Protein backbone atom coordinates (compact mmCIF):
# COMPACT_ATOMS: atom_id res chain seq x y z
CA UNK A 1 0.00 0.00 0.00
CA UNK A 2 2.85 2.38 0.79
CA UNK A 3 4.23 1.92 -2.73
CA UNK A 4 0.82 2.87 -4.16
CA UNK A 5 0.67 5.88 -1.84
CA UNK A 6 4.05 7.10 -3.04
CA UNK A 7 3.10 6.56 -6.68
CA UNK A 8 -0.21 8.47 -6.54
CA UNK A 9 1.47 11.31 -4.66
CA UNK A 10 4.19 11.65 -7.27
CA UNK A 11 1.64 11.55 -10.08
CA UNK A 12 -0.51 14.14 -8.33
CA UNK A 13 2.39 16.54 -7.74
CA UNK A 14 3.39 16.16 -11.39
CA UNK A 15 -0.18 16.96 -12.42
CA UNK A 16 -0.41 20.01 -10.14
CA UNK A 17 2.86 21.43 -11.43
CA UNK A 18 2.18 20.68 -15.10
CA UNK A 19 -1.38 22.02 -15.11
CA UNK A 20 -0.63 25.23 -13.25
CA UNK A 21 2.51 25.81 -15.31
CA UNK A 22 0.44 25.39 -18.47
CA UNK A 23 -2.09 27.90 -17.11
CA UNK A 24 0.84 30.23 -16.31
CA UNK A 25 0.11 30.29 -12.61
CA UNK A 26 3.56 28.80 -12.05
CA UNK A 27 6.72 29.25 -14.11
CA UNK A 28 9.10 26.44 -15.05
CA UNK A 29 12.77 27.31 -15.45
CA UNK A 30 15.07 25.09 -17.53
CA UNK A 31 18.07 23.83 -15.55
CA UNK A 32 19.59 21.73 -18.32
CA UNK A 33 18.39 19.70 -21.29
CA UNK A 34 15.04 18.14 -20.29
CA UNK A 35 15.55 19.10 -16.64
CA UNK A 36 13.44 21.81 -15.00
CA UNK A 37 12.56 23.45 -11.72
CA UNK A 38 9.48 25.25 -10.42
CA UNK A 39 9.49 27.43 -7.32
CA UNK A 40 6.50 27.92 -5.06
CA UNK A 41 7.36 30.46 -2.40
CA UNK A 42 10.43 29.15 -0.57
CA UNK A 43 10.03 25.63 -1.97
CA UNK A 44 11.55 24.38 -5.21
CA UNK A 45 10.63 21.28 -7.20
CA UNK A 46 12.99 19.73 -9.73
CA UNK A 47 12.21 17.11 -12.36
CA UNK A 48 12.81 15.74 -15.83
CA UNK A 49 10.24 16.80 -18.42
CA UNK A 50 9.71 17.45 -22.11
CA UNK A 51 7.63 20.22 -23.60
CA UNK A 52 4.79 18.90 -25.78
CA UNK A 53 3.58 20.32 -29.08
CA UNK A 54 0.83 22.35 -27.35
CA UNK A 55 3.14 23.65 -24.64
CA UNK A 56 2.27 21.08 -21.98
CA UNK A 57 5.15 20.07 -19.73
CA UNK A 58 5.21 16.26 -19.59
CA UNK A 59 6.78 15.61 -16.18
CA UNK A 60 8.30 12.25 -15.27
CA UNK A 61 6.84 11.68 -11.77
CA UNK A 62 9.69 9.34 -10.78
CA UNK A 63 12.24 12.15 -11.18
CA UNK A 64 10.50 14.62 -8.86
CA UNK A 65 12.66 15.90 -6.02
CA UNK A 66 12.49 18.81 -3.61
CA UNK A 67 15.41 21.14 -3.00
CA UNK A 68 14.92 20.60 0.74
CA UNK A 69 14.97 16.82 0.39
CA UNK A 70 11.45 16.53 1.82
CA UNK A 71 9.22 13.63 0.80
CA UNK A 72 7.30 14.04 -2.45
CA UNK A 73 3.76 14.38 -1.11
CA UNK A 74 0.87 16.21 -2.71
CA UNK A 75 -0.21 17.71 0.61
CA UNK A 76 3.06 19.64 0.82
CA UNK A 77 2.65 20.88 -2.74
CA UNK A 78 -0.88 22.07 -2.01
CA UNK A 79 0.19 23.90 1.16
CA UNK A 80 2.97 25.61 -0.79
CA UNK A 81 0.51 26.53 -3.52
CA UNK A 82 -1.92 27.91 -0.93
CA UNK A 83 0.74 30.38 0.15
CA UNK A 84 1.54 31.42 -3.42
CA UNK A 85 -2.14 31.92 -4.30
CA UNK A 86 -2.98 33.45 -0.91
CA UNK A 87 -5.75 30.96 -0.22
CA UNK A 88 -7.77 31.36 2.95
CA UNK A 89 -7.75 28.56 5.51
CA UNK A 90 -11.27 27.60 4.42
CA UNK A 91 -10.24 27.38 0.76
CA UNK A 92 -7.18 25.34 1.62
CA UNK A 93 -9.25 22.94 3.72
CA UNK A 94 -11.74 22.43 0.88
CA UNK A 95 -8.96 21.72 -1.61
CA UNK A 96 -7.27 19.38 0.87
CA UNK A 97 -10.49 17.39 1.18
CA UNK A 98 -10.73 17.08 -2.60
CA UNK A 99 -7.04 16.18 -2.83
CA UNK A 100 -7.27 13.29 -0.39
CA UNK A 101 -10.46 11.95 -1.96
CA UNK A 102 -8.72 11.99 -5.34
CA UNK A 103 -5.64 10.25 -3.95
CA UNK A 104 -7.84 7.53 -2.46
CA UNK A 105 -9.60 7.08 -5.80
CA UNK A 106 -6.28 6.94 -7.63
CA UNK A 107 -5.00 4.28 -5.22
CA UNK A 108 -8.14 2.24 -5.77
CA UNK A 109 -7.64 2.52 -9.54
CA UNK A 110 -4.09 1.20 -9.28
CA UNK A 111 -5.26 -1.70 -7.13
CA UNK A 112 -8.08 -2.51 -9.54
CA UNK A 113 -5.67 -2.56 -12.48
CA UNK A 114 -2.86 -4.48 -10.79
CA UNK A 115 -3.78 -7.85 -12.30
CA UNK A 116 -4.77 -6.52 -15.74
CA UNK A 117 -2.25 -6.46 -18.56
CA UNK A 118 -2.72 -4.67 -21.89
CA UNK A 119 -4.38 -7.70 -23.48
CA UNK A 120 -6.90 -7.98 -20.63
CA UNK A 121 -7.74 -4.28 -20.89
CA UNK A 122 -8.31 -4.55 -24.66
CA UNK A 123 -10.83 -7.36 -24.16
CA UNK A 124 -12.54 -5.80 -21.17
CA UNK A 125 -16.20 -4.85 -21.46
CA UNK A 126 -16.33 -1.17 -22.56
CA UNK A 127 -18.40 -0.14 -19.54
CA UNK A 128 -16.03 -1.93 -17.16
CA UNK A 129 -13.12 -0.26 -18.94
CA UNK A 130 -14.72 3.14 -18.32
CA UNK A 131 -14.55 2.42 -14.60
CA UNK A 132 -10.79 1.90 -14.83
CA UNK A 133 -10.01 5.17 -16.60
CA UNK A 134 -8.34 7.98 -14.71
CA UNK A 135 -10.93 10.68 -15.23
CA UNK A 136 -10.57 14.23 -16.50
CA UNK A 137 -6.92 14.72 -17.56
CA UNK A 138 -6.73 18.43 -16.70
CA UNK A 139 -9.06 18.80 -13.72
CA UNK A 140 -6.52 18.33 -10.93
CA UNK A 141 -8.70 16.92 -8.15
CA UNK A 142 -10.94 14.92 -10.47
CA UNK A 143 -12.25 12.53 -7.82
CA UNK A 144 -13.18 15.01 -5.11
CA UNK A 145 -16.79 13.78 -4.75
CA UNK A 146 -17.31 16.26 -1.92
CA UNK A 147 -19.80 14.97 0.62
CA UNK A 148 -19.08 11.30 -0.08
CA UNK A 149 -17.68 9.18 2.72
CA UNK A 150 -15.96 5.82 2.33
CA UNK A 151 -19.22 3.86 2.17
CA UNK A 152 -20.58 6.08 -0.61
CA UNK A 153 -17.31 5.84 -2.54
CA UNK A 154 -17.35 2.05 -2.38
CA UNK A 155 -20.95 1.95 -3.51
CA UNK A 156 -21.04 4.63 -6.20
CA UNK A 157 -17.53 5.64 -7.35
CA UNK A 158 -16.69 4.07 -10.74
CA UNK A 159 -13.23 2.81 -9.72
CA UNK A 160 -14.89 0.49 -7.18
CA UNK A 161 -17.17 -0.93 -9.91
CA UNK A 162 -20.08 -1.22 -7.49
CA UNK A 163 -23.58 -1.97 -8.76
CA UNK A 164 -26.68 -0.41 -7.32
CA UNK A 165 -30.38 0.12 -7.96
CA UNK A 166 -32.19 3.39 -8.44
CA UNK A 167 -34.35 4.81 -5.67
CA UNK A 168 -37.83 5.80 -6.83
CA UNK A 169 -40.29 8.39 -5.62
CA UNK A 170 -43.72 9.36 -6.88
CA UNK A 171 -44.52 13.04 -7.42
CA UNK A 172 -47.84 14.70 -8.16
CA UNK A 173 -47.94 15.69 -11.83
CA UNK A 174 -48.81 19.30 -11.11
CA UNK A 175 -45.67 19.59 -8.95
CA UNK A 176 -43.17 18.79 -11.69
CA UNK A 177 -42.46 19.23 -15.40
CA UNK A 178 -42.29 16.08 -17.52
CA UNK A 179 -40.14 16.39 -20.62
CA UNK A 180 -39.16 13.59 -23.01
CA UNK A 181 -38.72 12.58 -26.63
CA UNK A 182 -41.92 11.99 -28.57
CA UNK A 183 -41.34 8.21 -28.61
CA UNK A 184 -40.72 7.95 -24.86
CA UNK A 185 -43.48 7.79 -22.28
CA UNK A 186 -43.52 6.76 -18.66
CA UNK A 187 -44.11 3.09 -19.50
CA UNK A 188 -41.10 3.09 -21.79
CA UNK A 189 -39.04 4.56 -18.97
CA UNK A 190 -40.17 1.87 -16.56
CA UNK A 191 -39.59 -0.90 -19.11
CA UNK A 192 -36.04 0.32 -19.68
CA UNK A 193 -35.28 0.25 -15.97
CA UNK A 194 -36.87 -2.95 -14.67
CA UNK A 195 -37.76 -6.46 -15.81
CA UNK A 196 -41.22 -8.01 -15.53
CA UNK A 197 -40.69 -9.33 -12.01
CA UNK A 198 -39.48 -5.96 -10.74
CA UNK A 199 -42.30 -4.21 -12.57
CA UNK A 200 -44.82 -6.38 -10.75
CA UNK A 201 -43.20 -5.50 -7.43
CA UNK A 202 -43.19 -1.82 -8.41
CA UNK A 203 -46.86 -1.90 -9.45
CA UNK A 204 -47.79 -3.59 -6.18
CA UNK A 205 -46.11 -0.78 -4.25
CA UNK A 206 -47.88 1.80 -6.43
CA UNK A 207 -51.26 0.24 -5.68
CA UNK A 208 -50.44 -0.18 -1.99
CA UNK A 209 -50.05 3.59 -1.75
CA UNK A 210 -53.28 4.22 -3.72
CA UNK A 211 -51.45 6.16 -6.44
CA UNK A 212 -53.07 6.86 -9.80
CA UNK A 213 -52.35 8.64 -13.10
CA UNK A 214 -52.15 12.00 -11.33
CA UNK A 215 -48.73 10.87 -10.08
CA UNK A 216 -45.46 10.26 -11.92
CA UNK A 217 -42.63 7.95 -10.83
CA UNK A 218 -39.20 9.60 -10.67
CA UNK A 219 -35.92 7.63 -10.51
CA UNK A 220 -33.16 8.96 -8.27
CA UNK A 221 -29.56 8.09 -7.59
CA UNK A 222 -29.56 6.46 -4.11
CA UNK A 223 -27.08 9.04 -2.79
CA UNK A 224 -29.25 11.83 -4.20
CA UNK A 225 -32.23 10.46 -2.30
CA UNK A 226 -30.34 9.95 0.97
CA UNK A 227 -28.41 13.22 1.05
CA UNK A 228 -30.55 15.69 -0.87
CA UNK A 229 -34.14 14.81 -1.74
CA UNK A 230 -35.12 13.22 1.58
CA UNK A 231 -33.83 16.32 3.39
CA UNK A 232 -34.32 19.30 1.09
CA UNK A 233 -37.76 18.17 -0.10
CA UNK A 234 -39.00 17.37 3.39
CA UNK A 235 -41.90 19.82 3.01
CA UNK A 236 -43.17 18.07 -0.13
CA UNK A 237 -42.84 14.69 1.54
CA UNK A 238 -44.64 15.92 4.66
CA UNK A 239 -47.49 17.44 2.63
CA UNK A 240 -47.87 14.25 0.61
CA UNK A 241 -46.87 15.88 -2.70
CA UNK A 242 -44.01 13.41 -2.97
CA UNK A 243 -44.05 9.78 -1.80
CA UNK A 244 -41.10 7.45 -1.32
CA UNK A 245 -41.43 4.16 -3.20
CA UNK A 246 -38.04 2.51 -2.53
CA UNK A 247 -35.40 0.76 -4.62
CA UNK A 248 -36.57 -1.09 -7.70
CA UNK A 249 -35.33 -2.36 -11.03
CA UNK A 250 -32.08 -3.17 -12.74
CA UNK A 251 -28.60 -2.70 -11.36
CA UNK A 252 -26.48 0.19 -12.63
CA UNK A 253 -22.78 0.91 -12.94
CA UNK A 254 -21.46 4.46 -12.54
CA UNK A 255 -19.39 6.01 -15.32
CA UNK A 256 -16.75 8.72 -14.98
CA UNK A 257 -19.24 11.59 -14.67
CA UNK A 258 -20.95 9.78 -11.75
CA UNK A 259 -24.31 11.05 -13.06
CA UNK A 260 -24.08 8.81 -16.13
CA UNK A 261 -25.14 5.26 -15.35
CA UNK A 262 -24.89 2.09 -17.42
CA UNK A 263 -27.57 -0.56 -17.03
CA UNK A 264 -25.43 -3.47 -15.82
CA UNK A 265 -28.34 -5.93 -15.83
CA UNK A 266 -28.95 -5.73 -19.58
CA UNK A 267 -25.51 -5.76 -21.18
What is each PLM-predicted segment?
Residues 1-267:
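Nucleotide/phosphate-binding site architecture used for ATP/NTP-dependent chemistry
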